[in-house]
Amino acid sequence: MTENAVNTAVTSTSSPAIPAETSAVSPATRAANRPLGTPLGKHPTRVLFLGAGELGKEVAIELMRLGAWVCAADSYAGAPAQQVAHEYRALDMANAAELQALFDEIKPDIIVPEVEAIATDVLAGTAAAGAQVVPSAEIATICMDRERLRVLAHEELGLPTTPYRFAGSLEELRAGASEVGYPCVVKPVMSSSGHGQSVVRSADAIDAAWTEAQEGRRAADEGDVSRVIVEALAPLERELTVLTVSSSAGIVTCTPIGQRQESGDYRESWQPATEPDGEAERARDIARTAVEGLVAKAQAAGETGWGVFGVELFVLTDGSILFNEVSPRPHDTGMVTMASQRLSEFALHARAI
């Protein structure tokens, strides 16, 4: 079987076209009123996963329980979600031509990005053509760009963050690091999983941090130069994740999740997190504000903004709470909800979609 072969003998059928008289209806109304169908019937709800890892696998299972037809795409065959989906594909999702060909073939009603290495221009074009991107193509683009996300969170929404500067050259990085002070953290504005990040404790290490950021950024093989963010190294006591659900019913925040990391890698999480009085509510307020801002961007672009968001927060030694980043999908620390809640983050994501 080739990498592009299907893993089950399923006949592909396109979803029925939206009648012309409903074209002016909002994306949220269309999504809420979409008949779910049955996965092997004539008119299934067709869901395409872009990324087929462990988290995607759990979401795929929940969507299939609700009656959706699922195709899981990743850069290699045999990824976890591909092993449970109705069909799978292996391709370079950052390649615009390959991704467009996949959309043309599958004709998805719903697209669920589970990774960040995606040709976002093609994703946005497909959303504009009527597909529901989860939570939205606009949100996916914002959340994979630290500069856009930080500007939204701090400068537009007024959320507390570490002091930061952006730099597009080594000289700008030197100046920015001097302004925020040492020690500081340097990250590419476009990277994931800690790639390209470094802690800089003196001006002597700035050159090495710039090189590390350029080599670790997303699409480092495409040449040019990546902008970076340099931010003060906060006196961190611990980190929290607040799962936040956006759906047709509004926005709901969940009890904060505590976590432990080693060398930047997630090791364990627990819910509820152990926090002093008032900390949970402050954390949930920050998470709600962040997601409200993102959903507003999605709706302004004509999209729903529905789904689960993992809002990452820093708790400092003085008890203050800072916004860090947002994952516009179920969060790895949220896997604990499979044991701690009646509905896991994956079930919530599927229902919100």
Give the label of every model feature segment.
Residues 1-151, 171:
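ATP-binding N-terminal substructure of ATP-dependent carboxylate-amine bond-forming enzymes
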Residues 200-311, 315-317:
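Internal nucleotide-binding/catalytic subdomain
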Residues 137-197, 203:
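A conserved helix-loop-beta module that forms one wall/lid of the active-site cleft
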Residues 3-7, 25-36, 50-52, 289-353:
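ATP-dependent carboxylate activation and anion-phosphoryl transfer catalytic cores
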Residues 110-113, 163, 229-231:
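Short catalytic-loop micro-motif centered on adjacent basic/acidic residues
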